[in-house]
Regions:
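Glycan-recognition and catalytic cores of secretory/periplasmic carbohydrate-active enzymes
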Residues: 1-417
């Protein structure tokens, strides 16, 4: 490929050669998720479809995303897999009566759950954008369906944030509001803007970032609250009794501090040089510094803890693979923006941790969860359901630095930087 700035520095072994090899290994692992009756199954620790797990909407979307990116990059021909996922979302997961997308479908075709989640719909938007860029049939229809549901039910013009959860008929809106759905909204909206150039997407992404970073994070000493009431008042004790929840954990989520740090800097590229956005770099650096200080080796053992309380004490000690992936991406982005070699030192250290402890050399992909002694566990994350975070960590340094992954791939293919 020859586009990795890291290789030009000669200061890390985790440059193009390593990243390309790992990306191809991850994609090969993910190919085992394809199932005959539509979409992608939930992979276990050995890369086999777990027949006890339903097909989850967000997993379908993440698979479309990773196959789509690597296909458009030319790393492999995955057009049939992208089409397979798009068809499943359109034909199986879409609610023909009430619109929107179900949360999960079991392997027999039965709907699972009684809600429609903003989290899922943001990933549908992201997948639809990437599939459209890949030229896959059915993708524009999927994009329109995702956009319609988001416009009608999830985007809140009063607070300029995304709603989180509706019932199946879109008649009752749950009072919970969350940061997680809005974080992935920023990712999807930025990708949609890069593809369509519709300012609606950019305006929404910037509004979400401003409220999240310049209000919620700043007003809480850069310890970003995750959970809110319907009027967007922080609920700091939410899930105190269920602290290791997969999507709504108690307290401060270390990986999300890193993820927001990266995302806001990527969005910031679209308003670079404009007045009034000084909070972007400030916020990104503050979030990163807090995640590093309180997350890495927080219990005197290598790796990042999952969560901490409001006194910066570890709560869930598990080492989630996605947290390390987001950490190396944030380090890379801040190094690209600032040129500060300390960020590259972090990048190298944390990739070394992934290389030694997280990558599964026997069965492939990455161990999704380790305990504080670095033993593989499945307390919060059974199996290895997707490669989304891991592949992103491999691809980001290989591509031109742009607001979204698909935008970067498009520019990469044009041969410009």
């Amino acid at each position: 490929m020859g586009n990795s700035l890291l290789d030009d520095t000669g200061s890390t072994i985790y440059g193009e050669k390593f990243l390309l090899k790992e990306a191809k290994s991850l994609i090969e692992f993910a190919r085992g998720s394809e199932i005959i009756n539509g979409g992608f199954g939930y992979l276990n620790s050995r890369g086999q479809v777990d027949l006890n797990q339903p097909r989850q909407t967000y997993v379908q979307c993440r698979m479309i995303q990773v196959f789509g990116l690597t296909h458009v990059m030319g790393l492999q021909d995955s057009s049939h897999l992208i089409k397979h996922g798009v068809d499943a979302l359109n034909d199986v997961f879409f609610d023909q009566r009430n619109s929107g997308f179900y949360t999960a479908i079991d392997l027999s075709g039965k709907r699972i759950g009684f809600s429609k989640l903003g989290y899922d719909h943001m990933f549908v938007l992201l997948a639809a954008v990437t599939a459209t860029a890949a030229g896959v049939g059915g993708a524009p229809k999927l994009l329109q369906r995702a956009e319609d549901a988001i416009d009608r039910f999830f985007w809140d013009p009063e607070f300029e944030m995304m709603n989180d959860q509706w019932d199946l008929e879109f008649s009752v809106l749950n009072g919970y509001r969350g940061i997680n759905v809005n974080m992935h909204a920023v990712e999807a909206l930025t990708a949609a803007f890069d593809l369509t150039k519709d300012n609606k997407y950019l305006d929404r992404a910037l509004a979400i970032c401003k409220r999240t970073i310049n209000e919620f994070a700043r007003n809480n000493n850069w310890l970003l609250p995750e959970h809110f009431s319907s009027s967007w008042k922080p609920e700091r004790e939410f899930n105190h009794d269920n602290p290791a929840d997969q999507f709504r954990p108690y307290g401060v989520t270390i990986g999300h501090l890193f993820e927001w740090s990266r995302l806001v800097m990527q969005v910031g590229l679209l308003v670079k040089g404009q007045a009034g956005y000084e909070w972007i770099e400030e916020g990104a650096k503050k979030l990163y510094a807090h995640a590093k200080k309180y997350g890495w080796n927080a219990d005197n053992s290598p790796g990042f803890i999952y969560t901490m309380d409001w006194q910066m004490r570890p709560v869930v000690h598990s080492r989630m693979h996605w947290v390390a992936a987001e950490a190396v991406m944030a380090a890379y982005v801040l190094w690209r923006i600032t040129g500060d070699q300390n960020f590259l030192t972090d990048y190298d250290l944390w990739w070394s941790f992934i290389d030694r402890h997280v990558i599964d050399r026997e069965f492939g992909s990455w161990h999704h969860e380790l305990d504080s002694q670095l033993h593989v566990i499945e307390t919060t994350w059974p199996g290895k359901p997707d490669i989304y975070h891991a592949l992103n960590a491999c691809l980001l340094p290989l591509l031109p630095f742009k607001p979204s992954f698909i935008g970067a791939v498009i520019v990469h293919n044009q041969g410009t930087s």
